């Protein structure tokens, strides 16, 4: 077959590097082709659809899909495979690759100026939430959660929004794996209580957490959907309990928060057609 030219790889003279056949890893090529195929709009793909899309046998497609699922880059409902937010960790890390952080940041800035509170966007990565974008007002006393912060999903408002968006079997698996430890006296630590709260989140389309993650911290979150209607992230506004009551959080902060999440959704649909 001869040498292959790698895309974007240049030698010291600025010429494309010729990659020998022996150095070309077909399984990596196949895995990236699968990710690319699943990145197109729609509700995921079956094994047969992936095989047709990338031009391989069903057996080969199945092995690649199961490998990527095992590594956490895909999820499946037993028939169709879809991408997971773990892809945010590829490339240059959680801040590159997908457009979410760049799209979200100006909207978070506007939300912060409206509410004068800490604002962020997080995704579900494994059993934890991962902060991918954030802004905060310039105050001595503030909520400290830099980009890259990981938190237990069950005890955070963004986590509950993301858990509420999971398929039933995915949520069952999460609840089987995770120990619901009390982080404060207010933390919900039983599966029935958490399920009831997730049902409430689905109905009202936002979550409020009152000092369950940390004493003195109240926060709200709203879902961010992709073009297929799946919950892919959550926007959050957080405040010190001494500044904001739960009633004020619901009345004054949740409406602009939900509007912000919807604005991010619209811009994401344009950025990732």
Regions found by a protein language model. Name each.
Residues 68-71, 118, 204:
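Alpha-helix C-caps/helix-loop-beta hinges
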Residues 224-227:
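Sensor-regulatory modules in signal-transduction proteins
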Residues 82-178:
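Amphipathic alpha-helical effector-binding/dimerization core
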Residues 2-101, 262-270:
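N-terminal helix-turn-helix
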Residues 215, 233-273:
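Juxtadomain coupling helices with adjacent low-complexity linkers
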Residues 218-222:
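Short hydrophobic beta-strand micro-motif common in sensory/regulatory domains
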Residues 2-8, 13-14, 140-215:
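Short, solvent-exposed recognition segments
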């Amino acid at each position: 077959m001869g040498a292959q030219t790698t895309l974007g790889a240049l030698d010291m003279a600025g010429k494309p590097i010729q990659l020998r056949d022996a150095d070309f890893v077909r399984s990596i090529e196949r895995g990236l082709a699968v990710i690319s195929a699943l990145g197109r709009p729609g509700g995921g793909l079956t094994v047969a659809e992936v095989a047709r899309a990338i031009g391989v046998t069903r057996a080969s497609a199945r092995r690649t899909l199961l490998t990527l699922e095992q590594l956490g880059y895909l999820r499946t409902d037993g028939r169709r495979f879809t991408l997971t937010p773990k892809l945010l960790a590829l490339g240059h890390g959680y801040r590159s690759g997908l457009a979410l952080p760049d799209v979200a940041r100006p909207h978070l800035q506007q939300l912060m100026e409206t509410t004068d509170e800490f604002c962020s966007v997080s995704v579900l990565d494994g059993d934890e939430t991962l902060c991918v974008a954030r802004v905060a007002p310039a105050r001595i006393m503030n909520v400290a959660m830099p980009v890259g912060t990981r938190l237990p999903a069950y005890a955070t408002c963004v986590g509950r929004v993301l858990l509420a968006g999971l398929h039933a079997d995915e949520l069952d698996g999460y609840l089987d794996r995770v120990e619901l430890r009390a982080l404060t006296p207010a933390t919900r630590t039983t599966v029935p209580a958490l399920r009831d709260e997730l049902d409430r989140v689905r109905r009202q389309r936002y979550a409020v957490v009152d000092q369950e993650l940390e004493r003195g911290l109240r926060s709200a979150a709203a879902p961010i959907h992709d073009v297929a209607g799946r919950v892919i992230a959550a926007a959050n506004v957080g405040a010190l309990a001494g500044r904001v009551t739960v009633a004020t959080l619901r009345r004054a902060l949740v409406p602009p928060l939900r509007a912000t999440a919807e604005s991010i959704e619209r811009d994401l649909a344009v950025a990732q057609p």
